[in-house]
């Protein structure tokens, strides 16, 4: 078997579309027209994810040299990596009654305020089968 054919980075760089599910019921979230609310995120093996992770890990290591990194800083770093790895989302994504444009800043805000979304995206980004076997 030629291991060169198993290129997780290339697959992760394409990303995976995650159809959002209600955090309590597991039902898919749909808009008024029956369309899924979906976010496309790069996999954790992607170049973007890896570069963002290195950057925030280095920053935290420098900031908290001989101290334990606080959980809030770890969580913020995760949201930053995830926001940077968010490629697009469906046009039916809204927050506080207004359409939300897919930007790094909006993604970070959304993931911080609704961490259940971040959890679903993290799960998909970490599941190599979700982007390699699609």
Annotate each PLM feature.
Residues 7, 24-26, 45-47:
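Residues that cap or initiate secondary-structure elements
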């Amino acid at each position: 078997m030629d291991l060169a054919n198993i290129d997780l980075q290339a697959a992760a760089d394409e990303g995976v579309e995650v159809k959002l599910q209600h955090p309590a019921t597991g039902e898919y979230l749909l808009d008024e027209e029956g369309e899924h609310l979906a976010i496309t995120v790069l996999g954790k093996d992607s170049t973007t994810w890896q570069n963002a992770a290195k950057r925030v890990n280095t920053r935290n290591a420098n900031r908290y040299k001989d101290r334990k990194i606080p959980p809030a800083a770890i969580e913020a770093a995760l949201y930053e990596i995830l926001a940077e790895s968010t490629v697009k989302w469906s046009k039916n994504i809204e927050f506080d009654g207004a359409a939300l444009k897919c930007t790094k800043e909006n993604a970070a805000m959304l993931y911080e305020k609704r961490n259940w979304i971040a959890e679903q995206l993290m799960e998909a980004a970490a599941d190599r089968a979700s982007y390699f076997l699609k």
